[in-house]
From Swiss-Prot:
Disulfide bonds: none annotated. SUPFAM superfamilies: YbjQ-like. Signal peptide: none annotated. Belongs to the UPF0145 family. This is UPF0145 protein STK_10800. InterPro entries: UPF0145_dom_sf, UPF0145_YbjQ-like. It comes from Sulfurisphaera tokodaii (strain DSM 16993 / JCM 10545 / NBRC 100140 / 7). Pfam families: YbjQ_1.
């Protein structure tokens, strides 16, 4: 499933304009753990010497966030939700070259307001 193809509403806000929350399903979490491989670390090290954006890490971070978000959406759908509000991201370093990326929010059922 691609986030772009999702039929679930996602927002960082605590409500969705034009919608009424009719049921709160609970907290949903999506987690992924990524390792910065040796090749990426070497390329990033060279790039950091000259300055500027480290594209290898940017791409890895974007992919990890999308994967965590997609997993959160799947959990929300499994609960019967059609929206997730108050979505946030967090990350932690688990080991020297491993990072945990978490997407979390509140799964809810919404209906269009009249």
């Amino acid at each position: 499933m691609s986030f772009r193809e999702s039929d679930i509403l996602i927002t960082t806000a605590q409500e969705l304009p034009g919608y009424k929350i009719v049921e709160v399903k609970g907290v949903v979490i999506g987690i992924t753990v990524r390792s910065r491989g040796l090749g990426g670390n070497i390329a990033a090290s060279f790039r950091s010497l000259i300055g500027g954006e480290i594209k290898e890490y940017v791409e890895m971070a974007e992919q990890a966030r999308m994967q965590a978000l997609e997993r959160m959406i799947e959990r929300a759908k499994a609960l019967g939700a059609n929206a997730v509000i108050s979505v946030r991201f967090d990350s932690n370093e688990l080991a020297q070259n491993m990072d945990e990326i978490i997407a979390y929010g509140t799964a809810v059922v919404v209906t269009k307001s009249i």
